[in-house]
Each structure stands twice: as C-alpha cells, then as structure tokens.
C-alpha cells in the first residue's frame, strides 16, 4: 500500500496560464509541505525542472494515475477552473490570488518560477536574441494551437488591421515576433513563430 501523501494540481489552458500556475504550485507546496506535488498539465515543459514539483504528467498521458495517486491514497485534488470564479470574472483579484483563494490555501505573495536547462537556454539564444534591438512579442490568435485549429475567432482574437498597425508603429525600435497559428494571418514586418514550435515558445521568458 502506498503511504505517501500527495497534492495533485491539474492545469489546462495556454502557456501564459501555465506560467502563472507555477506560482500557484509553489503556494500549494508551501501550504502542504509534507505532500509530494504532482502536476498534470498541457505544457509539461514549464514545470519539469522546478525543484518543488515531484512529478509532471501531460494531459492525456497519465497511465496508471488512478492506481498510483488516487485509489486508497491520501491525496488532495486541485482541479477547479479559476477563470469561472466570481472574483476573476468581476476582476476583484489578480489571477494567481483568485486561484489560491478558490483552493482555500494561504497566499503569501508567491511569484511564478521558471527553470531552464542548458539546451533550452541555447535554443532561446538562437531564437530570441538575434540583433541589438529589444524584442516585442505579439500573439494575435488564441485558443487551440494545433495545425488544424480555426485560424480566427472574431470574439477573441485581435483584428488583423489593428495588429498590423501595432507592428508598423514599433518595428523601427523593436525586433517583433508574431506567435501565430499555421493557418492564421501573418503580419508584415514581424518574424513568425508558429504555434507548433513549442520548444521555442516555452523559452521566450529567457529573453
């Protein structure tokens, strides 16, 4: 019988939400230091090098998870959605604080944490550090970032003409990268990082 105790933190959503979730993960660990922290998420690259995270699983790749962490095991489950809370919808609290309040854990100003290995550092240097100008990143199209995802959603995405105006205004002073879907409109004057280039995107914060 497994006598270990666990905190199981489930994160879904985009890259930015996962970065914010690292602060929530630290808060969970600080509130329950006697429990091993298990993370199930869409972007495992964000969590895999963090020292206070004991194990990382990608959503959909959780073989024997129930047997290892749920059945007859002392585990706490953190799997609610902060975007659907009253505090977040009414903008009463920042996302991280809303998240921690929803879980009933004490927030002590925990901040996001990112850890990169040497390969990721080299990839970041090769991708994001070209030229002398500071970089600017514009992400015009949200939602699912798969190859066959819808290219544009009028209720969520930035209109192409407005995005192009932003690039035209800043391109003299910044090296501009557009993170975009394979089939989404490409902005003139920007370097395009496709949504399928996950390794490059996850190293953006190094710049």
Question: Language-model segments: which ranges?
Answer:
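Catalytic machinery of carbohydrate-active enzymes
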Residues: 1-207
């Amino acid at each position: 019988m497994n006598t270990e105790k666990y905190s199981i933190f489930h994160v879904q959503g985009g890259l930015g939400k996962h970065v914010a979730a690292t602060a929530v993960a630290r808060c969970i660990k600080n509130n329950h230091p006697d429990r091993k922290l298990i993370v199930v998420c869409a972007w495992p690259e964000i969590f895999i090098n963090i020292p206070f995270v004991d194990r990382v699983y990608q959503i959909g790749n959780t073989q024997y998870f129930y047997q290892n962490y749920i059945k007859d095991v002392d585990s706490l489950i953190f799997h609610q959605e902060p975007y659907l809370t009253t505090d977040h919808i009414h903008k009463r609290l920042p996302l991280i604080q809303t998240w921690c309040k929803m879980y009933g854990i004490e927030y002590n100003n925990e901040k996001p944490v990112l850890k990169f290995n040497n390969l990721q550092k080299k990839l970041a240097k090769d991708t994001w550090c070209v030229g002398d100008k500071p970089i600017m990143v514009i992400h015009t199209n949200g939602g699912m970032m798969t190859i066959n995802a819808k290219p544009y959603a009028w209720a969520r995405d930035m209109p192409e003409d407005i995005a192009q105006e932003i690039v035209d205004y800043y391109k003299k002073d910044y090296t501009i990268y557009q993170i975009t879907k394979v089939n989404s409109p490409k902005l003139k004057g920007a370097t395009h990082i496709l949504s399928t280039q996950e390794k490059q995107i996850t190293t953006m914060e190094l710049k």
